A protein has these predicted regions:
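Catalytic subdomain that performs nucleotidyl-dependent activation
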Residues: 158-237
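A short, charged, Gly/Pro-tolerant segment at domain boundaries
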Residues: 241-253
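Electropositive phosphate-/nucleotide-binding environments in soluble metabolic enzymes
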Residues: 23, 27, 60, 132, ...
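Short, surface-exposed helix-loop/turn micro-motifs enriched in polar/charged residues
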Residues: 115-118, 152, 216-220, 242
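Residues that form or immediately flank small-molecule/cofactor binding pockets and catalytic motifs
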Residues: 86, 114-117, 194, 217, ...
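Short, structured secondary-structure boundary patches
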Residues: 69, 125-137, 170-175, 227-244
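ATP-dependent adenylation/nucleotidyltransferase module used to activate substrates
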Residues: 2, 8-163, 169, 199-207
């Protein structure tokens, strides 16, 4: 059973998501979260979903939304979260805050450890090796603990910036998908924030006082993604509707 529009507006859903008590940014995020889940059939009855919790605003908001969604009767889903620590990267997160945040939302948090040896393949960047090992750790944990879906906190901006990167550097119009079954694991990746704007998540994070993490990855700003985010912002200055044109190009052709 998929999540459908009728379910969202039943009494239980209305009780959990009282729009009249929400700030404007919260309403925008919730509406787009619901639309993404419905349009791309992301939630099904019986799903066991593991959220990849980095500690950033996007994954925190994803925890909050899916925790609320799990309290609705149909479709019934179970939600837990996992935070991965890379032991050989000087990257700090406030684990106590993440544990408290998940506990407040009724979500069990798993702390996982991983690492990588960059000398094994000098052709690969630290970012690639870190991401690959994080994903492998997450996938193996999910399978061994009976999860069938992994929820990632990528929003619409992330997906479109990836599209621009692939067009520019690979000559491909591929990008991250709202739902993606994995070939080598009995898992499906879902991105429930796929239609949500980053600016709205940022506003919610400020209004709800999400705690910003102490330090981000020291290699984050050296990637092409940071440069392409600037390009994306320039496109929106040229045309405020640019994101919707790009989305239609990829997902509505």
């Amino acid at each position: 059973m998929y999540l459908d529009k009728a379910v969202l507006w039943k009494k239980g859903a209305a009780f959990l998501f009282p729009f009249q008590n929400m700030m404007k940014a919260e309403q925008k995020v919730l509406k787009r979260f619901n639309k993404g889940c419905v349009d791309y059939h992301l939630l099904e009855d019986g799903d066991r979903i593991l959220i990849a919790l980095s500690g950033g605003k996007d994954s925190l908001e994803l925890v909050r939304l899916l925790a609320q969604r799990a309290r609705i009767y149909k479709p019934h889903i179970e939600v837990e979260a996992a935070h991965i620590i890379m032991d050989n990267i000087p990257y700090e997160t406030d684990r106590s805050y993440l544990q408290d945040f998940c506990a407040e939302n009724g979500i069990k948090l798993h702390i996982l450890h991983s690492s990588f040896d960059e000398s094994t393949d000098p052709r690969k960047t630290r970012c690639f090796l870190c991401t690959w090992n994080r994903r492998k750790t997450l996938f193996e944990f999910a399978v061994s603990h009976g999860f069938n879906k992994i929820a990632l906190g990528h929003h619409m901006d992330d997906i479109l910036v990836t599209l621009l990167m692939n067009i520019t550097f690979e000559g491909s119009h591929s990008t991250m998908q709202p739902s993606l079954p994995l070939k080598h694991y009995p898992l499906t990746i879902i991105r429930p924030l796929c239609l949500v704007h980053e600016a709205d998540i940022r506003q919610v994070a400020e209004e709800l006082h999400f705690t910003k993490q102490k330090a981000l990855c020291p290699y984050e700003e050296t990637t092409r993604r940071a440069d392409m985010q600037t390009v994306f912002h320039h496109l929106e200055q040229l045309n405020p509707e640019a994101r919707y044109s790009l989305w239609r190009y990829v997902f509505m052709e």
